[in-house]
């Protein structure tokens, strides 16, 4: 636990590598098309709980893993954004299922420490191309749903993306009160 606190206060923060392919602006929605690198990710999946409740369960597990709760006792530092996959119903509401993805820092990509918590899994993920839109505040499930609706409306007729999944991302620690950065990522098809 001390490693996690030390790491969150003094540790490094690495940005998940991506390249901006294009930018757009429609109906007061600014967005980017990005190619995001793949790699190894620590993941936690939670089902049968609303998104906000599932996040309160999953995020500390990922943070503890990054902070040193692993077989090597190494605090790795964080990568941003932390993302989580959500699965919309036909009406736009979200299913009671999510999967948190934490990209393991580059220094540990070739040989990541094994998680001590069995609910944390290490997975290899291919690169993805996304349509991304940024927004601020302390985001909750309703905010992600509303922002995803705005991004879909802005992309209507100009882009194709998956409708069965999208990513919600955050860049800031929970204790940051102002200037928070969140994003919605729709997966390009």
Swiss-Prot record:
Sorted alphabetically, which InterPro entries does this protein's record hold?
Reg_factor_effector_dom_sf (IPR011256), SOUL_haem-bd (IPR006917)
GO MF, any single term: heme binding
What's a GO biological-process term for it? Answer: circadian rhythm
Which UniProt keywords are listed? Cytoplasm
Record carries keyword Cytoplasm: yes
At the top level, the lineage of the source is: Eukaryota
Subcellular localization is given as: Cytoplasm
GO terms under cellular component: extracellular exosome; extracellular region; mitochondrion
This protein's major location comes to cytoplasm
- Can you state the subunit structure given in the record? Monomer.
Record text about domains:
Forms a distorted beta-barrel structure, with two helices that are packed against the outer surface of the barrel. Porphyrins are expected to bind to a hydrophobic patch on the outer surface of the beta-barrel structure.
Q: Its function? A: May bind free porphyrinogens that may be present in the cell and thus facilitate removal of these potentially toxic compound. Binds with a high affinity to one molecule of heme or porphyrins. It binds metalloporphyrins, free porphyrins and N-methylprotoporphyrin with similar affinities.
Family named by the database record: Belongs to the HEBP family.
Q: Provide the protein name.
A: Heme-binding protein 1
Instruction: Recall the taxonomic lineage recorded for the source organism.
Output: Eukaryota, Metazoa, Chordata, Craniata, Vertebrata
